[in-house]
Swiss-Prot record:
Entries under InterPro entries matching the protein: SPATC1, Speriolin_C, Speriolin_N
Protein name as annotated: Speriolin-like protein
GO (cellular component) term, any one: sperm head-tail coupling apparatus
Signal peptide: none
Pfam families: Speriolin_C, Speriolin_N
Gene Ontology terms describing biological process: actin polymerization or depolymerization; positive regulation of cAMP/PKA signal transduction; spermatogenesis
Biased composition (Basic and acidic residues): 123-133
Family: Belongs to the speriolin family.
Cystine residue pairs: none
Location(s), subcellular: Cytoplasm
Chain segments carrying region Disordered: 42-73, 94-135
Other notes: Highly variable expression among individuals is associated with differential sensitivity to the DNA alkylating agent N-methyl-N'-nitro-N-nitrosoguanidine (MNNG), decreased expression being associated with increased sensitivity.
Presence of keyword Cell division: no
Length: 340
């Protein structure tokens, strides 16, 4: 039964397609016959009146009137009358296959191709006219292609985005304010990310300032090369000898600080490079923070929440460890978290 029902539905669809093709053939033949009759009737008549002499005699009615304007106005009237009469004739014979159309609105679309064909060509609508006439002029095409060509297609227009307040309607003012708030939030997110890099930078500066007291210019000093810088600082520039006392003192300070930080989980093999990674990734603050206007930079809890919001989970544990180390050193020296 299922196969029989499928066969019947297939036969019905093929029958409907055949009826459509027969209807298109009839309309095509009628169109060609009417066009040939109109061409035969208008072939013997000259639409343009005989051209006047280039130099009319004196006192003639046509003297002083330009020829081209007169001929253009006279020639337009018969062509317009002939086009309109032929259009009405075709539209009256257009619903040739009304037995196939069940809805009362089917006759109107059938008249549209004829009117589009007979109407004078417009520069902006000739594409749509050619698309609608193509099934009538080539009835041997596939019925599926004809169906797709007859269906109206919507023009895809690019969306216009504007931010000027004068060009936006009243209802779109909220949309504009939303876009501006989003831009400001992106700027705020970038600033918060710089705070993460500033935490790593401040920790490195605290470590270097503790190991090398009295050294104001730390250009070229990093936590990773502290042992090398201890030897370089302990070497006298005059004779190249090593100041053993200074070397021993700097080494003891470095080992004592490393022992305190290792209790918090800090590793001399991992976290110096990780601090450089955070600084290069997020950057540092461009100007000195105002602690009275923004107490975020002096609150360990607020900084911890910011790090959780900004840093991805893969680097979150080590980033929080650097913050804990910075807070511990800030408690020992009594200075703010972000010391400038």
């Amino acid at each position: 039964m299922a196969e029989g029902g499928e066969l019947m539905s297939r036969l019905l669809s093929e029958n409907a397609d055949l009826k459509k093709q027969v209807r298109l053939l009839k309309e095509n033949q009628m169109l060609r016959r009417l066009l040939s009759q109109s061409c035969q009737e208008g072939g013997g008549h000259d639409l343009l009146p005989p051209r006047a002499h280039a130099y009319p005699e004196a006192g003639s009615p046509g003297s002083g009137v330009p020829d081209f304007g007169r001929f253009t106005s006279v020639a337009d009237t018969p062509s317009q009358l002939q086009t309109s009469s032929l259009e009405d004739l075709l539209c009256s014979h257009a619903p040739l296959s009304s037995e196939d159309d069940t809805s009362p609105g089917c006759a109107a679309p059938s008249q549209a191709p004829f009117k589009a064909f007979l109407s004078p060509p417009e520069p902006h609508s000739h594409r749509g006219t050619d698309r609608k006439l193509s099934p009538l002029l080539s009835p041997l095409q596939d019925s599926l292609v004809d169906k797709t060509l007859l269906e109206p297609r919507e023009m895809v227009r690019p969306k216009k985005v504007c931010f000027s307040e004068s060009s936006l309607p009243t209802g779109d003012r909220t949309r504009r304010s939303y876009y501006l708030n989003e831009i400001q939030s992106f700027a705020g997110a970038e600033k918060d990310a710089r705070v993460v890099g500033e935490i790593a930078f401040q920790l490195d500066r605290r470590i270097l300032a503790y190991v090398f007291p009295g050294v104001t210019r730390l250009y070229g000093f990093t936590v990773a090369n502290i042992p090398e810088k201890i030897e370089q600082t302990s070497t006298k520039s005059l004779d190249g000898s090593v100041d053993e006392r200074k070397l021993r003192e700097l080494t003891q300070r470095y080992l004592a600080l490393s022992a305190r930080l290792e209790k918090l989980g800090y590793s001399r093999d991992v976290h110096p490079a990780f601090s450089e990674f955070l600084i290069n990734t997020y950057g540092i603050l461009k100007q000195r923070p105002d602690l009275r206007a923004n107490p975020l930079h002096s609150s360990p809890a607020a900084l911890r929440k910011l790090v959780i919001d900004v840093v991805p989970p893969k680097f979150l544990g080590d980033s929080l460890l650097l913050l804990n180390c910075l807070c511990e050193l800030s408690k020992e020296d009594g200075k703010p978290l972000f010391a400038w």
